[in-house]
Amino acid sequence: MTSSMRPVLVIGMIVLSVATFSGVSEWRAAHAKEIIPWRDDLAAAQAESRQTGRPIFAYFTASWCPPCQKMKSTTWADNTVKEAMQKFVPVKIDVDSQPEPTARYQVRAMPTYLILSDSGQEQRRREGLMLPEDMVRWLEK
């Protein structure tokens, strides 16, 4: 190898390393596991709420929602959020496959979070991306 090729080889190795590690980080974020024990049926969540006395945390989401996808690898994978969520019956509502509750609660933005009574009465609402520390603060109000 000639000395004039060394800088090209070194730069090439650096570019390849950065591209590889960047791809790994994105893959990990996309495949992070949610640790919230989501229910997927609002009526069942209401029944559980009546039995336990815990209010319902309703999370309205969609597969095409970028902030919702980011929350999978951040907020919903965070242990402090999981701990704060133990005071609630968490239910995840896909707006595309569950249009009835989406319409009933007039959900217009993704993601939307509602705190509901056991009868389904809305008590609090918030919309948009929430990182773990913001979610915990909101849940503890």
Task: Give names to the regions the model predicted.
Residues 52-65:
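Short active-site neighborhood of thiol/selenol oxidoreductases, capturing the structured segment around
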Residues 104-108:
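A short glycine-leucine-enriched loop at secondary-structure breakpoints
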Residues 95-102:
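Structural microenvironment flanking redox-active thiols in thiol-disulfide oxidoreductases
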Residues 1-35:
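N-terminal targeting signals for export/organelle localization
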Residues 57-58, 90, 113:
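Hydrophobic beta-strand anchors of alpha/beta hydrolase catalytic cores
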Residues 38-55, 85:
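A short beta-strand-turn-helix
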